[in-house]
Amino acid sequence: MTTVIQHPLVDHRMTYMRDVATQPKLFRELVSEITTFLAYEALRGIKTEEVTVQTPLAKTTGRKVAEHVVLVPILRAGMGMLDAMLRVLPYAKVGVLGMQRNEETAEPIPYYAKVPPVKGDELAIAIDPMFATGGSAVDAVAQLKKARANHARFLKRRGGTGRRPFRRFPSQKPAND
C-alpha cells in the first residue's frame, strides 16, 4: 500500500527542506517532523485490540496496537527517517536494506540485506525518502517478501524530483496489501 500525503504543514516543511540555504540540523529536524506525519497517515489502519487499564479513579477500556511491525530503512537516506518512526512505534523490530543506483540504467543494485524474519501477521514497512522511478521500492518489497512478509508498505515522502515517482511501483506492489 502506498500513502501519499497532501497536507499544507508537510508542504511548508518540504519547502524549507529543499532550500539549499537550510542548515543540516534544521534539515534533519524537518525530515523527522515530516516522517512523523507520514507515519500517522500510513499507520491509520494498523490493527488494534481492546484492553482494560486501571486509571487513578477506575478501570476503563482503551485500545493498544496489536500488530507487530518491522521497520526496514533503505541505506543511507532511509536512516534519517528511522528515529521518527521509532518514536511512533518504539516496539518495532528493525532491519536494513542497502541499495545503490546504477547510473547508466537508473536501476537499483542491492548490496546489503539484513532483515529479521517476518512472521505472517507482522507488518513490514520499507522506509526511503528517495523515490524517483520506484525501482528501489519494487526491490525493497521483493526483499521483504524474501523475509516472508505477508503485509508490506512503503513509506516515503512525496515530492522528490518531480519526475513520475510512481512509474513502476503501483503495478508491482504486494498483492495482499
Q: Could you tell me what each predicted segment is?
A:
Residues 1-177:
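PRPP-associated nucleotide enzymes
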